[in-house]
Curated annotation (Swiss-Prot):
EC number(s) on file: 3.1.26.3
Protein name: Ribonuclease 3
Organism of origin: Streptococcus pyogenes serotype M5 (strain Manfredo)
Catalytic residues in the record: D51, E123
Assembly description: Homodimer.
Binding site for Mg(2+): E47, D120, E123
Gene: rnc
Length: 230
């Protein structure tokens, strides 16, 4: 924790008052489950809070930055900014991946590299920062870490995976693409959806995500990866 505190202080000028919040933000459920007798808290509730404040701040930013963009355009751009893959990238940029506490099994299976875990970690950190320092501190942090990438136009140049898949398949002829929810698991604040892509009646790929939209994007990403190998 001491090294993490030093990182936050030197790189982002952030000093937590309540270090318990910071420690909880960097504790994965797998670690908490392995230390159940010690009553260790995990970061899912902070992730829920961080997701909400991230959506709000990015929405405010896009609304002010792009007065001529439509609601649909802003929604699409926001979804690219806050998607799991993007948030995992920001976690790595901040070196957060080096400090998350994982259970032994999750560590061995490569959890420290997994986008799902790192994206959730980034949101949990935002939730902890909100509770400890307030929303203006979260705004300052995002302005330092995320906003420069938005202003470079990095996210506007990225097509979503569903669009890319549709364009690819349409080059092969007429196709009917259907996204179907296979399962929905977990509590309301930590849902896990599984979605399959059915093309002309045959299952092409499957994907996972915290929402139906994210699961669809993951399934489309997996489909594109499969098709590139053919």
């Amino acid at each position: 924790m001491k090294q993490l505190e030093e990182l936050l202080s030197t790189s982002f000028d952030i000093q937590f008052n309540d270090l318990t919040l910071l420690e909880t933000a960097f504790t994965h459920t797998s670690y908490a489950n392995e230390h159940r007798l010690l009553n260790v808290s995990h970061n899912e509730r902070l992730e829920f809070l961080g997701d909400a404040v991230l959506q709000l701040i990015i929405s405010e930013y896009l609304f002010a930055k792009y007065p001529k963009k439509t609601e649909g355009d802003m929604s699409k751009l926001r979804s690219m900014i806050v998607r799991e893959e993007s948030l995992a990238g920001f976690s790595r940029f901040c070196s957060f991946d080096a400090y998350i506490k994982l259970g032994k099994g999750e560590e061995k299976s490569g959890g420290r590299r997994r986008d799902t875990i790192l994206g959730d970690l980034f949101e949990a950190f935002l939730g902890a920062l909100l509770l400890d320092k307030g929303i203006d501190a979260v705004r300052r942090f995002l302005k330092q870490v995320m906003i420069p990438q938005v202003e470079k136009g990095n996210f506007e140049r990225v097509k979503d995976y569903k669009t890319c898949l549709q364009e690819f398949l349409q080059t092969k002829g007429d196709v009917v693409i259907d996204y179907q929810v296979i399962s929905e698991k977990g509590p309301a604040h930590a849902k896990q959806f599984e979605v399959s892509i059915v093309v002309n009646g045959a299952v092409l790929s499957k994907g996972l995500g915290k929402s139906k939209k994210l699961a669809e994007q993951d399934a489309a990403k997996n489909a594109l990866a499969q098709l590139s190998e053919v």
